[in-house]
Amino acid sequence: MLAFIRFLFAGLLLVISHAFAATVQDEHGTFTLEKTPQRIVVLELSFADALAAVDVIPIGIADDNDAKRILPEVRAHLKPWQSVGTRAQPSLEAIAALKPDLIIADSSRHAGVYIALQQIAPVLLLKSRNETYAE
């Protein structure tokens, strides 16, 4: 699963770095990114891992208010980030304050705040929680 997420992020960044706009399909449907995201907030630790693997550093992470929840080797690779609360209950105020241009959320865990997140920035909904490695 993590390999697929890394592949997806790498492909997404490759496509939008060479084009003016890119249409992205996720678990909720499709949306268009007008430019390459520079200020990304992730609401799952696996998404932070995947971004770090392709040298993309999120500005905000739902790290459960504990930086040690992120794997040490990933934490060493990331610049200081702003905690945006817990994965189960991310802080919409903290996310909005960071002025992200993309939020990456879990399609199951964050379904209840999806509309509120969309008011802040485009939201990429991916599967992370309750997934197996085969998926």
Walk through the language-model features, giving the residues of each:
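Extracytoplasmic substrate-binding proteins
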Residues: 30, 112-135
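Bacterial Sec-exported substrate-binding components of ABC uptake systems
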Residues: 2-46
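Proline-aspartate-enriched helix->loop->beta-strand connector
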Residues: 92-94, 99-104, 122
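A short, structured surface patch at a secondary-structure boundary
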Residues: 45-94
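Short coil/turn segments
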Residues: 62-65, 106-109, 128-133
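Structural recognition of the beta-strand scaffold that forms the well-ordered cores
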Residues: 41-42, 58-62, 103-106, 124-125
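Stable alpha-helical elements in mature extracytoplasmic
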Residues: 47-50, 91, 109-113, 135
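Short, flexible loop segments at the rims of nucleotide/cofactor-binding pockets, characterized by
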Residues: 20, 36-38, 79-85, 101-103
